[in-house]
Amino acid sequence: MAQDEQVLVVERKALEQAGMFQGLAFDVERYFSRIFVPGVPRYMSRPQAEADPAYKQLIPYVIMTCDGKVLSYVRGRRAGETRLVGLRSIGIGGHINPADDMPLFSADSREAYLAAVEREVAEEVSVEASHTNRVVALLNDDSTEVGSVHLGIVHLWALDSANVGKREQMITQMAFMSLPELREVRDTMETWSQLCLDGLAEMTR
């Protein structure tokens, strides 16, 4: 990672005020009303954020579905997060940087966040399909080193066609897979994807 990279974070105590959880939380508005208010989101150097569990880096985690199948891929050697290399994932997304021009101290921070997610996804994959975009859950996993300093915001994109191509070299073996196929390879997935796979029925209601 670049030593001067700035990433979007919130203090852990903002989550604690809304109710700390382990795994998935489906009451999105309860947490968004604490996170996306002026003065709460801020930028911090990524090396500092990676070492300080008092802060959570906000990570959009976009799950794409089409005709009952879910987009999946394996994180290759060029993955930015080396601790996840070689693991299967069903989430597209990454850190939000200041270049995303998100107004942190205005009432529009939530809308700006959603626009930043679209840009982040476009850096990793090309989506030549119309889609819906719903925030369906928040994801917290304090049981791992990676998870303790990140908070996932799980988006569900329902695509009207499977026309998705990769842009990032770290994305390998990309394909739409059925739920039975994904369950067969669950043990090869990163923890966040395992949690999302287990909660997919709730997310798609």
Residue positions per predicted region:
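N-terminal leader/linker segments that precede catalytic domains of diphosphate-processing enzymes
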Residues: 1-171, 177-205
